[in-house]
């Protein structure tokens, strides 16, 4: 009997060949739920959409995998963590739409619908670490990417999760791309709602320090690209600068691009003035680290 990951790799190969001009969703993989995962977030209510393309009360982790255009395959892949303040997921412009763009440019992209922490910070971290293990375990070659080139992308609170995978997880990505990420819990600098949702009644000075990820950077943190706007009033730009400085202090390759306007949460939206610029920046940076 074939292993599940082998079957998934076969599906990806077939989908990537058949849909080279479509880059549509190729495969859906249910990772686990609160009854089968190592930890539960305690959410017993059904998953819901409080508004279109916003998913709340997530209690089952799922990967939605979009295969790279085989004619452009770079050998790289990404796990994408949408934002939403750790209470919901902005699954379109920070998830599916972004994944399709990566796939069209030769990078297999897997959108992670991760479980909301609901005061259990270990829950989304174990989801993203398992997602990375799954992607790294797919058969090299057949899927258009290799295990050593699986990176992570995250936006806002999803950026905090991506940075957590890069600093706290045992299975780390090969690289990380962070869009206007939540990084620090420091007073006056933090997006407090994200940390309240992440830590719940466990929140303390000690947990704030631990989950302020500029404090967790080491020489083992992967190369990182940060993209943000100077006028972000939701997640202050200092979150990114703190992380960037910590990366450089630890000898980690890093690049940061700060756009003058755009605010917060632009993702791959077409109305973001610097959309084409960030897209070219990402492709150039990925090409550079692949050498």
Residue spans of the language-model regions?
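Short beta-strand/loop motif that positions the catalytic acidic residue
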Residues: 220, 226-228, 232
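C-terminal catalytic histidine-bearing segment of alpha/beta-hydrolase fold enzymes
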Residues: 241-291
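Catalytic nucleophile-loop/oxyanion-hole region of alpha/beta-hydrolase
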Residues: 89-99, 110-149, 269-277
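Conserved alpha/beta-hydrolase "acid-adjacent" motif
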Residues: 233-242
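Short beta-strand element of the alpha/beta-hydrolase
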Residues: 74-83
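Active-site nucleophile elbow and catalytic-triad environment of alpha/beta-hydrolase enzymes
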Residues: 61, 201-216, 221-222
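Primarily recognizes the serine-hydrolase "nucleophile elbow" in alpha/beta-hydrolase
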Residues: 130-194, 198, 208-209, 213
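N-terminal cap/lid segment of alpha/beta-hydrolase-fold proteins
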Residues: 21-72
């Amino acid at each position: 009997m074939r292993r599940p990951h082998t079957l998934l790799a076969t599906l990806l190969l077939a989908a990537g060949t058949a849909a080279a001009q479509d880059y549509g969703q190729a495969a859906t993989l249910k990772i686990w739920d609160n009854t089968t995962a190592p930890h539960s977030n305690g959410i017993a209510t059904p998953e819901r959409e409080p508004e279109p393309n916003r998913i709340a009360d997530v209690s089952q982790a799922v990967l939605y995998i979009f295969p790279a255009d085989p004619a452009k395959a770079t050998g790289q892949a990404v796990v994408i963590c949408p934002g939403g303040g750790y209470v919901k997921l902005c699954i379109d412009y920070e998830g599916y739409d972004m994944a399709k763009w990566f796939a069209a440019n030769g990078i297999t992209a897997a959108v992670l619908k991760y479980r909301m922490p609901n005061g259990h910070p270990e829950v989304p971290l174990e989801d993203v670490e398992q997602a990375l293990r799954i992607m790294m375990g797919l058969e090299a070659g057949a899927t258009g990417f290799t295990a050593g080139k699986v990176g992570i992308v995250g936006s806002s609170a999803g950026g905090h999760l991506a940075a957590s995978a890069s600093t706290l997880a045992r299975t780390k990505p090969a690289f990380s791309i962070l869009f206007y990420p939540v990084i620090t819990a420091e007073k006056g600098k933090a997006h407090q709602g994200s940390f309240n949702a992440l830590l719940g009644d466990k929140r303390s000075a000690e947990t704030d320090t631990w989950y302020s990820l500029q404090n967790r950077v080491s020489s083992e943190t992967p190369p990182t690209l940060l993209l943000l706007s100077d006028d972000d009033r939701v997640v202050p730009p200092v979150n990114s600068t703190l992380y960037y400085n910590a990366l450089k202090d630890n000898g980690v390759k890093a690049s940061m691009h700060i756009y003058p306007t755009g605010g917060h949460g632009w993702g791959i939206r077409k109305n973001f003035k610097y959309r084409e610029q960030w897209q070219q920046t990402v492709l150039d940076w990925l090409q550079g680290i692949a050498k």
